[in-house]
């Protein structure tokens, strides 16, 4: 029973201390992840365009 009280108390202190700190490092991490997602999206759009052109060339070559 005492362990549960200690655990809840420590979790509360941790939540308060993390809530008061500035989220600068978390924001930077989020921006990096967002940028990776944007690059992945852009690359997949380019690949789909190239694949469509290749399919058109193959269909034209077959007649």
Swiss-Prot record:
Pfam families: Cecropin. GO terms for biological process: antibacterial humoral response; defense response to Gram-negative bacterium; defense response to Gram-positive bacterium; innate immune response. The keyword DNA-binding does not apply. This is Cecropin-B. It comes from the Eukaryota. The modification Arginine amide is found at residue 62. Belongs to the cecropin family. Cecropins have lytic and antibacterial activity against several Gram-positive and Gram-negative bacteria. PANTHER family: CECROPIN-A1-RELATED. It comes from Drosophila mauritiana (Fruit fly). Residues 1-22 form the signal peptide. One of its GO terms (cellular component) is extracellular region. The keyword Metal-binding does not apply. Keywords: Amidation, Antibiotic, Antimicrobial, Immunity, Innate immunity, Secreted, Signal. It is found in: Secreted. InterPro entries: Cecropin (IPR000875), Cecropin_insect (IPR020400).
């Amino acid at each position: 029973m005492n362990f549960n009280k200690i655990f809840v108390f420590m979790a509360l202190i941790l939540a308060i201390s993390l809530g008061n700190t500035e989220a600068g490092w978390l924001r930077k991490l989020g921006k990096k992840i967002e940028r990776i997602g944007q690059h992945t999206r852009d690359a997949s759009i380019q690949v789909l365009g190239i694949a469509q052109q290749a399919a058109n060339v193959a269909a034209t070559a077959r007649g």
